[in-house]
């Protein structure tokens, strides 16, 4: 059993604690301060846009949340409980899944193996790791999950390394969507997708909080996508948070200004 969750943190009176909260996160890579006292919160059923130019600290932050990096200072809370996330397995035990820009796929494996790596179905189910791989069940479920995203692949038997960038992206998104039970983190999920696949991913992002009660952190440079699906947006620059905005067509210019450093909330 994972020991990722410790004792509950004090919650504000009468307020349900955020499903995910980061307080005072700092991270150094040698002399480079990748994160500088970053605090964000994600409420249950919410879609949070995490915005910023390249090098703003977004990827470092989400890799700290998912156990890839360890914070030098600050804490991560899940449902108000301090979470000691030491590895991606700890994050998964807490229901957190992520799709990174590098996709983290195994090019020499097929679609089904990539979708279920570390979450293999076995028979009998109660034996778990001691059972036999239920390849038929995994393929059936993989087809159902990809069909729900309207992703059509030329062959399930082909290795992922032979697929197009858009097909690989779709497999990575489908894997994360399939196993996220609390928080889904998506780092530029539509970057390599065509128009139809992009539409399907955006529809899935909008649907997940309502249908499955999964909260989402979306990293995107596409302001139109942020306005369409996000409930709030946090803007990062040079490792710190410089503003929080409710994304609408009217606030799009404000978000861009925060990203490029033309203004900060402190100036208002």
Protein language model regions, located:
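Glycine-rich phosphate-binding loops of nucleotide-dependent enzymes
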Residues: 2-268
């Amino acid at each position: 059993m994972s020991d990722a969750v410790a004792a509950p943190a004090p919650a504000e009176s009468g307020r349900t604690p955020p499903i995910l909260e980061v307080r005072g996160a700092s991270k150094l890579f040698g002399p480079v301060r990748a994160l500088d006292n970053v605090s964000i919160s994600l409420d249950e059923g919410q879609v949070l846009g995490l915005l910023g130019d390249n090098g703003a600290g977004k990827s470092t932050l989400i890799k700290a949340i998912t156990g890839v990096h360890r914070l030098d200072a600050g804490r991560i809370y899940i449902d108000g409980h301090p979470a000691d996330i030491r590895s991606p397995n700890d994050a998964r035990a807490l229901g957190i899944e992520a799709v990174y820009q590098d996709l983290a796929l195994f090019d020499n494996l097929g679609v089904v193996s990539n979708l279920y790596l570390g979450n293999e179905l076995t028979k009998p189910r109660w034996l778990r790791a001691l059972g036999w791989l239920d390849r038929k069940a995994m393929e059936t479920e993989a087809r159902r999950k990809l069909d729900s995203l309207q992703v059509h692949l030329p062959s399930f038997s082909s290795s992922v390394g032979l697929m197009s960038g858009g097909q690989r992206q779709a497999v990575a998104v489908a894997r994360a969507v399939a196993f996220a039970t609390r928080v889904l983190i998506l780092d530029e999920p539509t970057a390599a997708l065509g128009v139809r696949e992009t539409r399907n991913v955006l529809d899935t992002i909008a649907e997940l909080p309502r249908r499955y009660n999964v909260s989402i952190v979306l990293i995107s440079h596409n302001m139109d996508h942020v306005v369409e699906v996000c409930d709030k947006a946090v803007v990062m620059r040079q490792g710190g948070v410089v503003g929080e905005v409710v994304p609408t067509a009217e606030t799009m210019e404000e978000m861009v200004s925060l990203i490029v450093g033309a203004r900060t909330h402190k100036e208002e």
